[in-house]
Each structure stands twice: as C-alpha cells, then as structure tokens.
Curated annotation (Swiss-Prot):
Gene name tied to this protein: GLR2.9
Region (Disordered): 876-900, 914-940
Tissues expressing this chain: Expressed predominantly in roots.
One record GO biological process: calcium-mediated signaling
Domain of life, per lineage: Eukaryota
Protein localization: Membrane
Glycosylated residues, chain numbering: N25, N39, N115, N338, N345, N528, N771, N776, N805
Organism of this sequence: Arabidopsis thaliana (Mouse-ear cress)
Protein's UniProt name: Glutamate receptor 2.9
Extracellular face residues: 24-566, 650-811
Coiled-coil stretches noted in the UniProt entry, renumbered to this chain: none
Length: 940
C-alpha cells in the first residue's frame, strides 16, 4: 500500500513539472485591431504589407514570447463606420492596439476613443496636421505630418522667385488642416485659396478652374486626395491650364500616390508638374521586400496589378515597431476593467472598458528605434520624422528627381549635395523656360496714356500717319517700361491714348470702370483719385511749388563785398593784422634798419608790412628768426582767409543774381497779381483754397506757354507759375538764368501709375520702382530726359548760402595766436636774459629807473646783431680798398646844413646796376652815449 502511494506521488509531481515546463514555452497573444477600407486598392495594398510584417517579424524572432494576432474590420469608406469598427474591436475583442484610421477624416473620433480606453491607435496614412491638436498620448502618427513639407515648398518658391500662388485644396479636414501651415511658410508670398468639395462633379471643378484662369495667378499648389487631384489635372489640361506659363506643384501624399492611380497612366496627365515627397532610401531589404510583396499581393488579388507605395512601407514598419513594443512591455495586465462586460451593446459608449495594458504599451512603443523599410523609424512627440524630401518633376511616364531638401542644407541638386540649386525642369507645355508666375489675362495689359498739349518730355503720343499706330514716349513711359522688366512675370502692355488731356480725373476713373487695366503718365497721386484706383509708389519728387522770375540786378549792392564775412570776423581779422605788425616791429626794430626811424615812420612801416601780407606784397625783409616764424604762420592764415573770402564772395554775387521777384504767396494774393497753373491739373483747386480769386488764375499747357506768360510780367502776364515740382524742375533745367523756384512747397503724392483696386500689379510695380530707385536707374532716366546745363547753379543751394563767421576760423586764429604768443615769450625771455645785469646790479637806482634804462636799451640798435656787424665790415672795406667808381657814376649829394659843424658823412651806394652805380652821402648820427649809427643801405 505504501509502495502504491509512493508511486502515485512521483507520478503527480512529474505531471506537475511537465505542466510547468510546457507553460514556460507558451506565447502570449496580443490582439491588434486593423481598421481599413477593404474595398479600396490602397487598403488592400497596405493590408498585404501588414500581414507580411507580422509573418516576417516572427520568422526572424521565433523566440519572442509575444505574438500579434490581427483582427481586421472594414470601415467601408465611411467615417461613422470606422468609429463603429474601432468601438467593436475594443468592446468585443478587447484589442491592445488599433492600426488605423486610413484617412484624417476618420481619425477624430477614433483618437478620442483611444484616449478614453487607453488603447494606442497607430495611423500610417492620416497626415493632417489638425490631428496633432487633439492632445492624446495614445494617438501615434507613424507617417509624415503634412506640415513638415511646407518649408520645402517655401524653398522652391524662393528659388524660382514666385510671389503669388493659389492653393487648391479639398474642403475637408485633410485640406483645411494643411492651409494654416502653408500660409505661415509662405509669408513673403501672397497666397489665395481655391476650395474644391470632395464630392465635386466635373462641371463644378471646371467652373472653379475657369475662375482661376481669369485671375493673374499662374502658380498653383494642389493638396487633396489623389483621386480627386487626378480629375482636377485632367480638366485643367482640357481647358488649357497645363500649357506654357503655368506652374503646378503637388504635396507629399499626392506625389507618392499619383503613379498608383489608374495603373500609372495618370503620369501623362500631369506632365511638367512638380511634386514634393518624403525620401525613401534604397536598400537591399527594400528591394527583396518589393519582389515578395508583389508575388503575395498578386496571389491575394489576382485581378489587380499595382505597385508598392510608401504608405504600405509605413504600415509594415508600424507593425514591426508594435511587435517590438509588446515584447518589451509588461504582459501581466493584458485585460480590461469591468466596464466592457456591463453591456452587450457593441455601440454603447457609456460601458466601454479601459485597457490596463495600454499605458505600458504606449510607453514602450514611443521608445522603439530601428531602421525600417521606409527609413529610420523614430518617433518624436508621437510623430514620425522625415529628415529629407525629394523634389520631383513628372516628365512623360517618369518621375525625375531634380533635387532634395533637408532642414539643415535647404535645397540641393540631385547630382551634387554641394550645389544649392535644382536640376533642369520640364514645365507644362514641355517648356524649359522658368515661368514668371503671373500673367495678365488676355495676354496684354491695356494701358491708358494721356495725349498732352505740352510737357512732352513726360508723355508724348506719336501717331504714325501710315499705320495710324500710336507710340507713347517720354520720361514716365520709360520709367514704366523699366519697371516692367523688373517684374517676376511677363506683362505685354497695349497702349491706348486718352483724348481729353485736361481731365486726368476722368482718365483715372476709367480704370475704375475697367476701360483700362492701368493708366501711365504724369498722373499725380491725390486723395480723390485714390478712391477709384490704387497707385504705385511715386517715381518723382512730390510737391507743388512756385516759380518766379529773378530780379534784373545790373547794379549790384554797393557793399556786397562785405557780405561774405560777419562783423566779428572782420573785426578779429583787422585786430590780428595790427597785432602782427606790432609783433614784427618788436622783433625787428633793433636789428633791422627798415623798421627804424621816427615813431610815425616805424608805425607806418609796421602796419604797411602787416597789411601788405594780405596780397603777399610786403617788400621789407625780416632778419630775426622769430619774426620769420611769425610771418610764415601769419601768411598761412592769410592764405586761408583770402581763399575763403573769394569763394564766399563769388557765392554771394551769384545769390544776388538769383534773387526772386516774389518770395511770399500772401503778397500775390494781397496784390491780386495773376498767377499761372497747368491746365487740367489739380493745382487750380490748391490755389483757390489758398485764397486766390478765379480771375487771378491763368492756365498754361506747356513750358513755352509758362515762359511767355512770365516774360510779359505781372501786368500783362503772370507774376508766378504754380505747378508740380517735377514740371518746374524741367523748366528750370533749360531756363535757370531766368527763373527760380521758391518756397513754400505744398506736399502732394507725386507721380504714380494707377491700377484697379486690389490689383496685385500695384504692389509689384511699387517694388519694381523701389528697385529702380535704389539702383539709380530712375536718376539715369531723369538725366536723359531733363539734362541740366553745366552753367546752371542749383537755386536752392545758392539761396541757402550763409556768411562765414568767426566760429568758422576760430581754430585757425587760435593756432596763430598761440604760436605768436609763444614767440613773444621767447623774445622777452632772451632780451631779459641778455640784459640781466641791468636789473640785477647793486646800484641804488630805483626799479623804475632801471626799467626806463632797460626800455632805452630796447629802443636802440642791437650792435651785436650780425646785420650791423656785416654793415660795419662793409663800410670799412669800401671804397678805399676796392675799385674806385668812375666819376661818371659817382654822385656826392651834400647833406642839408645843420647846427652841427662836425657832422660826418657816409658814402651810400644807391645802385648795383652793372652799367651804373650811384652813391649818396648820409650823416653819421652821434648819440649822447657816444655810439654812432653807421648805415649802409642798398637801394634797388
């Protein structure tokens, strides 16, 4: 009995151990729901990839303890049915994750359901950016968000310099979610909208496209489902919108899917179209998978022939990532709470359960990283990232890659990553010329041009007598045609003349009633005219001013020569002349006989020397170094002063010749003088507003008429002419000596071109005018039409001349004064040092007597000077020891009798002419101190 019990015990233990071993080798089943539109080719392609992903993954990982089991539901291409299918999977199958939805419209409710039940919902094809705004950690986008491509699109626009675009999009969540991001990326581009309903019939699409043909836009960005986009392109081709000059650009999803619609035959419809699509790197694994997928798909769907698309690759990678995540996540909580068992109604939202496995699965899924078939699988904030986009050009049945775009490098050539450019493009109509992006409907722009009676330099219409063709020329026309060349698109103008030149208001109004597409000429921008048309930026100087004759000043102002300098400058200069004469006398009178003699003689000589430097005519020689230094400094000052005075005097004489006869408008009104204005201009309204009477106003039609009226004077003609500054400058450029333009200037808008309200051409032409102005083209055109005479001074500059005042030369006088003062100090110091014994002797004389004696010494000759030493030697050696002049060349002139009978005489040579020498005698003066002056002067 004991033996039987022992055997039974061993048998039970062995059975239990076998059960434990078998339990360790069992795998956990993870239910995964799949919601697809099973009747569509797109969903069948993706479902094949999903099934192959499960099979391939576990074939490569046989030891994994988890297994995905797929539960597929058909959404029947209906948003409500897709939501019902997801709810059924959660309530009846208690799935741990859902693959779907297939499009963005089905996603809204499914995301909210996933958030409530904590069931991760993974989409590989819903790309609308609006889904990101639904904050749910359980929604994972394993595909590219449409907003990630807008920067690549913006780079294309910048590269081709397109400034206008029409965004054609489908009227649902898929289309509307993309538009805000496109608008933000194209901030420098004007974006217009065109909405196509998802159920639109061909007639509705054609009607919308014909509206776009009537606009000026020729660049279109298309964002909609591929099937609808194909119809749009087919209709666009039928009505002529796929011809030369048009630009079509498709977004990412459409570019990927166009080849798969209608079995690839759709590429002929979209020839010349550009596209942006996410880059899928080539690999051996991808090539092998394509072959296997094609065999599997044709086996499952024998009647279908299609190719693998990028969304099927993302579906494959999504399943691979999910399989990795469930293996990593904790599988101990693979159940729902009791909520799902409270009701058997599959659509009862109130009793839906909550997955306890969801949080750990969501966390594990967000951390998965690997290189999949579509590239790197890496989620950031629940979204797949695409670091690279391809720029595609559809040519024939080919998809040519013409470039790439990355966030770091921007656009790159497809053949070289170093080139920031794109490859050659074949545009619609098989054109190789880059479209400018805009075109005027009807091919030509009807431009109204006024037929003027004068001022033909601005606008002139010439009529060919044979062909009756009208050709406009002039400054305004050349500015307009130069601006045309700056536009990023082709505009062909058709000029039509306006036969009422005296009524520019009517001319502008005809832009409002669509008679003209634009008005070009000398059209002044006014507030009243801006009510009916939009104006470009002005291309001329703005303002209305007054032109008057200049005075006939044959007799100039008597004292005009004093005008260049101010009073303080005259006084300062005169004081410096006196000061310089005094300083030179101080330095020279002890060593230079030219500065000696009676007091009045010394004063006259000093002043003569100083003032003669004004014209550099001083003949006295200076012998002391200090005096020479002072003279050099002062001559420089005099040079600057005289040159400045000459220039200023010339300016003042010019100003006098340009003095206007009238300077005040109020004087004209008060004196009831007649004034002129250009007929048909708004200037008449300004003059009436200032207070002029109707009988004071006389119109003129041309510059010659204005000249005739002004020449007659105010008694028979006019006292002043009022007009736009541009007209007055044109007159002055040829008659600068007769007239002058004076203040005040009444501000106006200047000349501009008129376009219909809200016309995009207004902004384009304004930018073109700015470019012309910045590049100096406007000034060059103005110089050609209004050349200035070389001898014409600028009246505004001449009338603004100012006197030169002391502050203009304060630095110069400061330098000269400092140098002269320094010389004085040196001179005084040397003199005191030389006669220091006079002040420092031990005699009992008072300081006053010593100073008097010192001044007496200062007034005497400095016999120690080299000048007097040389003279003494010269007198001793002549004429005894030298050749005696012949009697015919020597004249002895007796000195007048004086009380002194012992006066000595010296023989003075008064001529060193080779043919004649004359000598004169001059007494030798004896001083009280026993010294004598011996003078030997050479006169020439």
């Amino acid at each position: 009995m004991k033996t039987n019990n022992t055997f039974l015990s061993y048998f039970v233990c062995g059975f239990l151990l076998m059960g434990v071993g078998l339990g360790q080798n069992q795998t956990s089943e993870i239910k995964v729901g799949v919601v697809l539109d099973l009747n569509t080719t797109f969903s069948k392609i993706c479902l094949t990839s999903i099934k192959m992903a499960v099979s391939d993954f576990y074939a490569d990982h046989p030891n994994y303890l988890t297994r995905l089991t797929l539960h597929v539901r058909d959404s029947m291409e209906d948003t409500v049915q897709a939501s019902a299918a997801a709810l059924d999977l959660i309530k009846t199958e208690q799935v741990s994750a859902i693959i779907g939805p297939i499009n963005s419209m089905q996603a809204d409710f499914m995301i909210k359901l996933a958030n409530k039940t904590q069931v991760p919902t993974i989409t590989f094809s819903a790309t609308s950016p609006l889904l990101t705004s639904i904050k749910s950690p359980y929604f994972v986008r394993a595909t590219i968000d449409d907003s990630s491509q807008v920067r690549a699109i913006a780079s294309i626009f910048k590269f081709f310099r397109w400034r206008r675009v029409v965004a054609i999009y489908v009227d649902n969540e898929f289309g509307e979610g993309f538009m805000p991001f496109l608008f933000d990326a194209l901030q420098d581009v004007e974006v217009k909208r065109s909405v196509i309903p998802p159920e639109a019939i061909d007639d509705e699409i054609q009607k919308e496209l014909r509206k776009l043909m009537e606009r000026q836009a020729r660049v279109f960005v298309v964002h909609m489902e591929s099937s609808l986009a194909l119809r749009v392109f087919q209709i666009a081709r039928d009505i002529g919108m796929m011809e030369e000059g048009y630009v079509w650009l498709m977004t990412n999803g459409m570019t990927h899917m166009m080849r798969h619609i209608n079995n690839g035959r759709s590429l002929n419809t979209i020839e010349g179209v550009l596209g942006v699509r996410s880059h899928v790197p080539k690999s051996k694994e991808l090539g092998d998978f394509r072959l296997r997928w094609k065999r599997t798909f044709e086996k499952e769907n024998p009647s279908m022939r299609d190719d693998l698309n990028v969304f099927a690759l993302w579906a494959y990678d999504s399943i691979t990532a999910l399989a990795k995540a469930v293996e990593k996540a904790n599988t101990k909580s693979l159940w729902y709470d009791n909520g799902s068992t409270l009701s058997k109604n599959r659509t009862d939202l109130g009793n839906v359960g909550v997955s306890l496995y969801g949080p750990s699965l969501q966390k594990a899924f967000s951390e998965v990283r690997f290189n999949g078939l579509a590239g790197e699988f890496k989620l950031i904030d629940g979204q797949l990232q695409s670091p690279k986009f391809e720029i595609i050009n559809f040519v024939g049945n080919e998809e040519r890659i013409i470039g790439f775009w990355t966030p770091r490098d921007g656009l790159m050539d497809a053949t070289s990553s170093n080139k920031k450019t794109l490859g050659p493009v074949i545009w619609p109509g098989k054109s190789k010329i880059v479209p400018k992006g805009w075109e005027i409907p009807g091919k030509k722009l009807r431009v109204g041009v006024p037929m003027k009676k004068g001022f033909f330099d601005f606008v002139k219409v010439t009529i060919n007598p044979i062909t009756n063709k009208k050709t406009p020329t002039g400054y305004a026309i050349e500015i307009f045609e130069a601006a045309l060349k700056e536009l990023p698109y082709l505009v062909i103008p058709e000029y039509v003349s306006f036969e009422s030149p005296n009524n520019y208001n009517n001319l502008v109004y005809q832009v409002y009633d669509k008679t003209w597409d634009a008005v070009v000429g000398d059209i002044t921008i006014t507030a009243n005219r801006s009510l009916y048309a939009d104006f470009t930026l002005p291309f001329t100087e703005s303002g209305v001013s007054m032109m008057v004759p200049v005075r006939d000043n044959e007799n100039k102002d008597t004292w005009v020569f004093l005008e260049p300098w101010s009073l303080e400058l005259w006084v300062t200069t005169g004081c410096f002349f006196v000061f310089i004469g005094f300083v030179v006398w101080l330095f020279e009178h002890r060593v230079n006989t030219d500065f000696r003699g009676p007091p009045q003689y010394q004063i006259g000589t000093s002043l003569w020397f100083s003032f003669s430097t004004m014209v550099f005519a001083h003949r006295e020689n200076v012998v002391s170094n200090l005096a020479r230094f002072v003279v050099v400094v002062w001559c420089f000052v005099v040079l600057v002063l005289t040159q400045s005075y000459t220039a200023s005097l010339t300016s003042f004489l010019t100003v006098q010749s340009l003095q206007p006869t009238v300077t005040n408008v109020n004087d004209l009104i008060k004196n009831r003088d007649c004034v002129g204005y250009q007929g048909g201009a708004f200037v008449k309204d300004i003059l009436l507003g200032l207070g002029f009477h109707e009988d004071q106003l006389k119109p003129f039609d041309s510059a010659k008429d204005a000249d005739d009226l002004l020449s007659k004077g105010k008694s028979k003609g006019i006292a002043a002419a009022f007009d736009e500054v541009a007209y007055l400058k044109a007159i002055l450029s040829q008659s600068c000596s007769k007239y002058v333009m004076v203040e005040p200037t009444f501000k106006t808008g200047g000349f501009g071109f008129a376009f219909p309200k809200n016309s995009p051409l207004t902004g384009e032409f304004s930018r073109a005018i700015l470019n012309l102005t910045q590049n100096n083209v406007t000034q060059q055109i103005e110089d050609r039409w209004f050349p200035k005479k070389n001898d014409c001074p600028d009246p505004m500059t001449a009338l603004s001349s100012n006197r030169l005042n002391l502050s203009s030369f304060l630095g110069l006088f400061l330098i000269a004064g400092t140098a002269i003062s320094f010389s004085l100090l040196v001179f005084v110091a040397l003199f005191l040092y030389e006669h220091r014994h006079t002040l420092g002797d031990d005699s009992e004389d008072s300081l006053w007597r010593k100073l008097k004696f010192l001044f007496k010494i200062f007034d005497e000759k400095d016999m120690n000077s080299h000048t007097f030493k040389n003279s003494a030697i010269h007198n001793i050696s002549s004429p005894m020891t030298h050749k005696t002049p012949s009697p015919s060349t020597v004249q002895i002139t007796p000195w007048p009798q004086s009380p002194s009978q012992n006066r000595e005489f010296e023989l003075r040579r008064v001529s060193f002419s080779p043919s004649e020498e004359r000598f004169t005698t001059q007494p030798i003066i004896h001083h009280e101190d026993g010294e004598s002056d011996i003078e030997c002067r050479v006169e020439q």
